[in-house]
Swiss-Prot record:
Record keywords: Methyltransferase, S-adenosyl-L-methionine, Transferase
Binding site for S-adenosyl-L-methionine: D205, G231, D232, F233
Family, as annotated: Belongs to the class I-like SAM-binding methyltransferase superfamily. Cation-independent O-methyltransferase family.
Upper classification of the organism: Bacteria, Pseudomonadati, Pseudomonadota, Gammaproteobacteria, Lysobacterales
Gene: phzM
Origin species: Lysobacter antibioticus
Protein name: Phenazine O-methyltransferase PhzM
EC numbers: 2.1.1.-
Entries under Gene3D superfamilies matching the protein: Vaccinia Virus protein VP39, Winged helix-like DNA-binding domain superfamily/Winged helix DNA-binding domain
Domains: entry comment: Contains an N-terminal dimerization domain. The C-terminal region contains the S-adenosyl-L-methionine binding site.
Length: 341
């Protein structure tokens, strides 16, 4: 008797079917996030007619979406046609410290559409997003402010969730000046500065992002110790930091562009400086790892990639750095530490 035929075993066909239809879940969560359902039921369960009226949806159709995702723990149907919050659904609220609503929206809109062309991407090498939209992903964001805002909110939300794991895994006490390159709204830099009251920071990103980050830094209680600088890391980065942090940045770029960023960091860095890359470092072999899926996502969006430790060594060798160590964190991210040579 095979494993698949034993009483109670889930048929392999059922397992594969669940994988094949995964996009059903993505888009159902997108509907709930986009319509703001979690905000509407945060204080108490609401009837579907009220939810439909407030969101401009058709009540019978919205009910079908909500009852389906309630079956996987996202919302609960407390009585027939009345839906309430659950711990998972609470993550889809707006403006909360642990909100994942921007991520659900981001992955359900342009990024979702790009995945329709992944076969073309694999066969031709043309980035799927560029095939779908006729421009690069960051070029698209530059022309679509709302998509850019959602992207930066999603990035900030994810980084905020993992920042404490990074701070717990690494000793930042030797550094007086911390420079975060491509920092977004600065959740990681804020966490580092809160852990090191004597340190000062510089947040570096595109001018419009750096400008928006000032308010976030003040809200985090570190605005008086952290400056913001707008610029282009392909041209130059702020000089004389004791440590340069590139968190979830190099995976947005191919090797050539990544080396350009690293060389600019090397030129700006004093001899005693450190470089910290915070990313999902790919393990060798077949073990399941979220970073392998993110590697494909970077291919689809940007023609870029996640990397192994050896691939980071190659980048460092071409840009004036030497790998010192790779430190895992509780978040799944790793801290790749390098020194200038």
């Amino acid at each position: 008797m095979t494993e698949n035929n034993r009483a109670g075993a889930v048929p392999l066909s059922s397992i594969l079917l669940q994988m094949i239809t995964g996009y059903w879940v993505t888009q159902s969560l997108y509907v709930a996030a986009k319509l703001g359902i979690a905000d509407l039921v945060a204080d108490a369960p609401k009837p579907i007619e009220e939810l439909a009226a407030k969101t401009g949806a058709k009540a019978p159709l919205l009910k079908r979406v909500l009852r389906t995702i309630a079956s996987i723990g996202v919302f609960t149907e407390t009585e027939p046609g009345i839906f309430g919050i659950t711990p998972l659904a609470a993550l889809l609220r707006s403006g909360t410290p642990d909100s994942m609503r921007p991520q659900a929206i981001m992955h359900g809109e342009e990024q979702y559409r790009a995945w329709a062309d992944v076969l073309h991407n694999v066969q031709t090498g043309e980035t799927a997003f560029e095939k779908e939209f006729g421009t690069s992903y960051f070029g698209y964001l530059a022309k679509h402010p709302e998509a850019d805002r959602v992207f930066n909110e999603a990035q900030a939300g994810y980084t905020k969730q993992v920042a404490h794991a990074v701070v717990d895994a690494y000793d930042f006490s030797p550094f007086k000046t911390v420079i975060d390159i491509g920092a977004g709204y600065g959740p990681l830099l804020s966490a580092i500065l809160r852990s090191q009251p004597e340190a000062r920071g510089i947040l570096f990103d595109q001018p419009h992002v750096a400008q928006a980050a000032g308010k976030r830094l003040a809200e985090a209680g570190v605005g008086d110790r952290c400056g913001t600088v707008g610029g282009d890391f392909f041209v130059e980065v702020p000089a004389d930091g004791d440590v340069y942090i590139l968190s979830l940045l190099l995976h947005d770029w191919d090797d050539q562009r990544s080396i350009e960023i690293l060389r600019n960091c090397r030129r700006a860095m004093p001899a005693h400086g450190k470089l910290l890359i915070v990313e999902l470092v790919l393990p060798e072999g077949e073990e399941p790892f979220f970073g392998k899926w993110l590697d494909l996502h970077m291919l689809v969006l940007l023609g870029a990639q996640e990397r192994t430790a050896d691939e980071f060594k190659t980048l460092f060798a071409a840009s004036g750095f030497a790998l010192e160590r790779v430190l895992p964190t509780a978040s799944g991210l790793s801290i790749v530490e390098a020194r200038p040579i």
